[in-house]
Amino acid sequence: YARLNRVNLDGKGKIKMLTPEEGNHKVTFSPSGRYIIDTYSRPDQAPRNVVRDVSGKLLFTLERPDLNNLYAEGWREPECFTVKAADEETDLYGVMWKPMDFDSTKRYPVIAYVYPGPWTEYIPLDFEFSSPSGAPQLAQLGFVVVCFGNRGGSPYRGRDYHCYGYGNLRDYPLADNKYGLEQLIA
């Protein structure tokens, strides 16, 4: 997730995280530069809007969206999860969509949405009702839809993670996908 941090440019002192809540943060500074409007969410958490001062101190929370009508219709947010990559060491983060009428006693076909990169990976970081992948819509057709990051995707996880698929853009995500799916169904 993206967060806002502060650090001294002289190299002294420690990095201070100004937006500590778990979620993907999008910030806007006030014209004076003294305040921050912080909007953050996760795939499984509706957006929250807060106002902070530039030290990161929470000043107040703005009104939250009311999702009661969505829940009344049976809508459910996707589930976030963590699995291990095929190397059994690297954490892979993912999201799972289930049908609104999901019954844990039944079996469902699974669709794994694979796009590991290069440069990016498709894992929603923010709350959204629909998805460019069509995952929520496929879930309503009776599938469980899963997507998770693969080694070789995001550069924000470090050089080794990002460059894992170098020279093999076709096949490298398959081992991680297979191993991740096996963990989810175990």
Where are these regions (language model features)?
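A short beta-strand motif characteristic of beta-propeller blades
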Residues: 13-19
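Serine-hydrolase catalytic core recognition
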Residues: 26-186
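Repetitive beta-architecture junctions, highlighting loop-to-beta-strand starts
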Residues: 2-4, 13, 47
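Short loop/turn segments that connect beta-strands within beta-propeller blades
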Residues: 8-12, 53-55
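Short secondary-structure boundary segments
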Residues: 1-9, 59-63
